[in-house]
Curated annotation (Swiss-Prot):
Disulfide bonds: none annotated. Transmembrane segments: none annotated. This is Protein MROH8. It comes from the Eukaryota. Pfam families: HEAT_Maestro, HEAT_Maestro_2. Signal peptide: none annotated.
Length: 483
């Protein structure tokens, strides 16, 4: 697909994607996890350990790389005209879609002159940074969940055209790597072709065939990737392409939000959230597999086994999340690291401030308690969590939810490595004037051995406090702890 072939046609092309349909809804193929049960002693974690998704198998792409259409050499006048047009963009800004498309077309046309025209070659190589910056802007300006024009396709075509002439815009520097990441994000964030078609039916623009544009865009993206290694097939370039360019920076935050929405009082919202969290589970499994530390293989295998055993109990994995947020915590707990667990807790508490519907609050309480019970030993930011609990307990009105949160505090305080941290936060709040913290003291529920340990640590802290200067003492006068 050279610049000469930039018009959408009805030609069938293969894309690395599939339609989403009710008959082919994503579901964990649990049989693929049998390798874990049968070979648990194996040291290496293989790709077979990761569940596959029926319905999303890709047909192989064409093995024939795209070649630019042979054209007559460009005259010096045309080359100069193209350079002036491109330079004008660098000196100004692209305002309309036609102007943007013209800029991309000019770049592709000029790329064809690189093998024989020194002026074109010198201009392109001296303006790599400008080209990368402009393409970055064009990709960023595209709506992430929409495909209403051929702009993405044109960007991919232009990058490929230059790559075939040994001008690589996605490799070799930080800004080029950023452009590479943006192009991949622009594809990943696209909804399914069915969703895009439905949007077009509701808001027709009459400019293009959505399905054709969707397929052409994916084909252009595929050929752009191929172009990166066709001319320079070195292993380091392959590694750059294969290496995962995206990672969830706030996975715990995302899981918590989706989990809370699974308990939304509006049935439609809860159902869509359940489907979304199911898809997120598949993405998380794949990400964790690709990025996991070799030293942590056994932990990942255990998490996969637990996930498999849990989902075997439910005929539909997506439906098992609907109105049952605590199950989400059970499934995801093994795939969240300590930072992500903290994000999960913080997001759940933050949501309690803005979403005060009883259903949401109940979901939040169940999520917190379930996660704390199963992963309490993995938390590394207990001080931050306790700070949030002490500050926000007053906004939680439902007795059941308050009790669940207090039970979470009980779990933390009963673990020796967290006892002093929890006591410090509770003692630093003036109990006689804070009925919410007084309730925490009264409702703490721990086993007898833990009670003895906690009381001993509490007495030690009280003694230490009385031995310190007055200005350094904690802000409390007395603490009454019911037996």
């Amino acid at each position: 697909m050279s610049s000469k072939h930039r018009i959408c046609s009805q030609e069938e092309v293969v894309i690395p994607c599939a339609y989403d349909s009710d008959s082919e809804s994503v579901d964990l193929e649990l049989s693929n996890l049998e390798i874990i049960k049968k070979g648990s002693s194996s040291i290496e974690l293989t790709d077979l350990d990761i569940p596959d998704i029926p319905g999303l198998h890709c047909e192989p792409l064409s093995h024939s790389p795209r070649h630019l259409t042979q054209q007559d050499p460009l005259s010096e006048a045309i080359v100069e005209k193209l350079i002036q047009s491109i330079q004008k963009v660098f000196n100004g800004e692209l305002k309309g879609e036609l102007e943007k498309l013209k800029f991309l077309g000019d770049l592709s046309s000029l790329s064809q002159a690189l093998p024989y025209d020194e002026t074109a070659k010198s201009f392109i190589h001296s303006h790599i940074a400008d080209i990368v910056h402009t393409l970055n802007v064009l990709v960023q300006e595209e709506r992430p969940h929409s495909l209403s024009s051929s702009m993405r396709q044109e960007v991919f075509v232009t990058i490929a055209d230059l790559s075939y002439q040994d001008v690589h815009l996605l490799l070799g520097s930080e800004d080029r790597a950023e452009l590479f990441s943006l192009t991949i994000k622009s594809i990943i964030t696209l909804p399914s072709v069915r969703t895009l078609t439905q949007i077009q039916e509701i808001m027709p623009n009459g400019t293009c065939n959505t399905e054709c544009l969707y397929r052409q865009t994916f084909q252009a993206f595929s050929e752009m990737l191929q172009s990166l290694v066709v001319k320079d097939p070195h292993l380091e370039n392959l590694d750059t392409i294969i290496k995962l360019p995206l990672r969830f920076q706030r996975l715990g935050h995302l899981v918590a939000l989706m989990a809370l929405l699974c308990g939304d009082p509006q049935e439609k919202v809860a159902e869509e959230a359940a489907e979304g969290i199911h898809s997120l589970l598949h993405i998380t499994l794949r990400l964790k597999y690709i990025t996991h530390d070799k030293k942590d293989q056994q932990n990942l295998k255990r998490a996969l086994t637990k996930c498999r055993e849990f989902l075997e109990l439910h005929s539909s994995a997506a439906k098992c999340f609907y109105n049952c947020p605590f199950r989400i915590a059970q499934v995801f707990e093994g795939f969240l690291d300590s930072n992500e667990l903290c994000q999960f807790i913080m997001t759940t508490f933050d949501t309690l401030k803005t979403l005060k519907h009883p259903c949401i609050q109940r979901s939040a309480g169940e999520l917190l308690l379930t996660l704390a019970k199963n992963t309490e030993s993995q938390f590394e930011k207990v001080p931050e969590i306790m700070g949030v609990i002490c500050a926000q307990l007053s906004i939680i009105s439902q007795p059941r939810v308050r009790q669940q949160i207090i039970n979470t505090v009980s779990l933390f305080i009963s673990r020796p490595k967290y006892t002093d941290i929890v006591l410090s936060f509770l003692l630093c709040h003036p109990v006689p004037y804070n009925r919410h913290l007084a309730e925490v003291w009264r409702m703490l529920s721990v086993e007898l051995p833990s009670t003895t340990w906690i009381l001993w640590r509490l007495l030690r802290k009280l003694q230490k406090c009385h031995n310190e200067p007055a200005q350094e003492k904690m802000a409390y006068v007395a603490v009454a702890v019911s037996p």
